[in-house]
């Protein structure tokens, strides 16, 4: 692993050392390289899909707001990468190739809603990065100032760019809403994904066990979709009790 190699050969640290300095160095390197990987992945995808300018604008908006407004984080690296692709590439791609635009009155309503949302919920801390009570008012003021600056910028640029700026504001707004916490962190996907996978496996196991004691045909009820190329696995001798 690259991080372990750096710790051993560059930082001259023992990987098994549990001291604070070693653990914090490892934590820093893990966060740094994870962020670098995500950045390069998004950069490559934005070039491939032709959304480099839109992706850059969204990235700047979130980098500008997130340090003061806070917000939820995905609980796993893979979910973080998936959400990053959707936020930085997929939706900007749709915005770029869409001819639909919000009427002026709806934009005004959206802007007012965003200001209220940031006033009410920013800054939003997490279990890992809680907001200190002494910093609450300062961060709230900074959040509102930065939101207003971005809104002001959106009034003096082209329609497409303004739409992307507002989109970035909406995304950051969703990241601080309490109702979106489970969605962004991935708890919703984990809950329903676990349930779906469990049901599928249970049905397959029940189907396989029903054929025990009979002469099976080639790959009949095989749990392995690649069974005819990868060989067969011996089935249990007893049926599962119903």
UniProtKB/Swiss-Prot annotation:
Q: What InterPro entries does the record tag this protein with?
A: AgrB
Primary location class: membrane
GO CC annotation: plasma membrane
Per its UniProt record, what SMART domains does this chain match? AgrB (SM00793)
Alphabetically, which GO biological process terms does the record hold?
proteolysis; quorum sensing
Where is it located?
A: Cell membrane
- Going by the entry's taxonomy, the superkingdom of the source organism is recorded as Bacteria
Q: What sections of the protein cross the membrane? A: 29-49, 52-72, 78-95, 100-120, 160-180
Q: What are the UniProt keywords, alphabetically?
A: Cell membrane, Hydrolase, Membrane, Protease, Quorum sensing, Transmembrane, Transmembrane helix, Virulence
GO molecular function annotation? peptidase activity
Membrane topology according to the record: Multi-pass membrane protein
Task: Please give the family membership noted in the entry.
Answer: Belongs to the AgrB family.
What is this protein for, i.e. what is its function?
May be involved in the proteolytic processing of a quorum sensing system signal molecule precursor required for the regulation of the virulence genes for gelatinase (gelE) and a serine protease (sprE).
Name under which the protein is recorded: Protein FsrB
Q: Which gene is transcribed and translated to give this protein?
A: fsrB
